[in-house]
């Protein structure tokens, strides 16, 4: 057997450099789009798990409900659609920071899916913001979402970084 680090850049590099054949010491045929195939499968798995979490009542849909779940400490993670406005992301990010400041958990945020993908998986329309809630289905969905995030190697969202800086600067100004 052979191992490849589970991120897109390493898989693509292994395909390009024919490292599977070298590691297995024999000629192997690897699809040129293996990295994309793995991404699609991880994405499908994550979206399916999100749908199951919703059916189990462990997803809060909408900015207001997601923010309330974060502030109450019930949220395991926050999901933002790619189309999410900076203002909505900022408000939920502030709620996440306030929760941490109050001694609550550090709630991760993920921006991996489009509005259409989230809407289809979660059974809603115009799903821009959602929160995964505590429970077995929520934990399982978070595990799959986090695996996709790691595979894609996505850096923190630029809107979130900017919102964090604005919040930190405002806090420094009031001191």
Briefly describe each language-model feature range.
Residues 1, 56-57, 75-77, 103-108, ...:
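Short active-site oxyanion
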Residues 93-98, 146-148:
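Short, solvent-exposed amphipathic alpha-helical segments in soluble enzyme
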Residues 8-88:
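Extended interfacial segments that mediate partner engagement and assembly in macromolecular machines
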């Amino acid at each position: 057997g052979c191992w490849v680090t589970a991120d897109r850049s390493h898989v693509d590099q292994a395909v390009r450099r024919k490292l599977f054949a070298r590691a297995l010491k024999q000629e192997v045929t690897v699809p040129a789009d293996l990295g994309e195939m793995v991404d699609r499968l991880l994405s499908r798995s994550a979206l399916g798990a999100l749908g199951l979490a919703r059916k189990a009542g462990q997803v809060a849909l909408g900015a207001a409900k997601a923010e309330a779940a974060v502030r109450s400490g019930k949220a395991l993670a926050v999901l933002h659609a790619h189309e999410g406005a900076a203002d909505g992301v900022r408000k939920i990010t502030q709620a996440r920071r306030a929760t941490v400041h109050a001694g609550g958990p550090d709630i991760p945020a993920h921006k991996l899916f489009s509005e259409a993908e989230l809407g289809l998986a979660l059974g809603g329309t115009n799903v821009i913001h959602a929160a995964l809630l505590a429970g077995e289905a929520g934990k399982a969905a978070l595990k799959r979402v986090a695996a996709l995030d790691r595979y894609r190697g996505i850096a923190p969202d630029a809107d979130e970084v900017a919102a964090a800086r604005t919040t930190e600067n405002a806090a420094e100004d009031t001191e």
